[in-house]
Amino acid sequence: MIKPQLAKKIETVSFLQEKISQAKTVIVFEYSNLPVSEFMKLRRQLKKIDCEVKVYPKNIMQRAFMNTNYQDLVSLLKGIKALIISQQELLEPIKVIYNFAKQNKVVKIVSGVVEQKIVSPQEINSLATLPSKEQMLALLSVAMLSPLRQLAFALKLLSEKQATNN
């Protein structure tokens, strides 16, 4: 018979494993010496974009990652680590932790998983500086409308010139 504590740990590992497997974005970060008030501020920022930040015991995180396609992350789970898990958002949690880490030097991005691919801290930093989807669409629409505006302006000038010549 399995002890209740062990059963609870097994349940937690399988729950975390499932969350990691289904997530669009998972970020592992170190937060030693971060005041609780700052950690709660990060938690509130992430909650606004439907993401969660969780602290699990190291062995539970290691076992959960071992049972996924991300076994390479197990060796990085030394020290005090936390996870950001996002089921919907892809870049927003990356931007939040990137900006938070810039403000709080004790927070260090260790690694992550973005769209089922393990990414390094450098790749996470690169992704954080990308414009959002809305900004990209706005830039695309401006780029597509610019030639039309120029054509309309040229046609207007041409019609005004012809009107003054007649």
UniProtKB/Swiss-Prot annotation:
NCBIfam families according to UniProt: PRK00099.1-1 (NF000955)
Disulphide linkage map: none
Keywords: Ribonucleoprotein, Ribosomal protein, RNA-binding, rRNA-binding
Function field: Forms part of the ribosomal stalk, playing a central role in the interaction of the ribosome with GTP-bound translation factors.
Gene Ontology CC: one annotated term: ribosome
Highest taxon of the lineage: Bacteria
The encoding gene: rplJ
Name used for this protein in its record: Large ribosomal subunit protein uL10
Keyword Ribonucleoprotein assigned: yes
